[in-house]
Amino acid sequence: MPEFGIVMEPSAGYTARLAAEIEAMGFDALLCPDTQCLAGDPYGQLNLAAAATRRIGLSTGVTNPVTRDSSVTASALATLQLESGGRARFTIGRGDSSAAHIGKRNAKTAELRLYVEQVRDYLAGREVDRDGTASRLRWLVPGALPHVPIDIACTGPATIRLAVDLADRVSFAVGAAPERIRWALGVARERLAETGRDRASLRIGAFVNLVCDASEQR
């Protein structure tokens, strides 16, 4: 079945109430951007939203490999997963506004891959080699945390291929034009054919900007 979610900036005092409203409207997910100079902290607001809801998925929309260490992200996600009763999702991209507003560049594809692999291993309770230091979430019992789905937001072909390799979910960020969606789907399908991964094991979606107005031109 298709799912529909809303991307909403985390806003202290409002996120939990609005999360309850969109759940009552029938939406399936709430995603809060992790962009520290433009909005509040997403994880605190998502945990408050978890307490105010019962069904919807809760996710960053998106986080990035630049502004938080992978262990910090994993710890925040594990906490949200426990607080929400298993409704957390790990949605990540290369980093745009979050990096630009502190004078840093987006993560390269290889950096994104390493970061996602580290977060995945932390969440599974495994040790992660951090430049010779054996690191893990010592407060988390290995295997005790329900799986947190990995969702990679993709714009270019390299990131789409990476997402097909690593993620549970792929979210295209290529606009709403049908020809752009068809192109992105083509790249994903080619990678699935190359690796032999079962298409049924991967959920595919898209970020779409939606503006309601009586005038199409405006």
Regions found by a protein language model. Name each.
Residues 1-61, 148:
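N-terminal beta1-alpha1-beta2 module of alpha/beta enzyme domains
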Residues 2, 74-169, 174-202:
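Internal, glycine-rich beta/alpha segment that forms the wall or movable "lid"
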Residues 5-9, 33, 59-61, 91-93, ...:
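A cross-family glycoside hydrolase active-site/sugar-binding cleft signature
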Residues 34-37, 63-64, 175-179:
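Short, acidic/turn-prone active-site loops that include or flank metal/cofactor-
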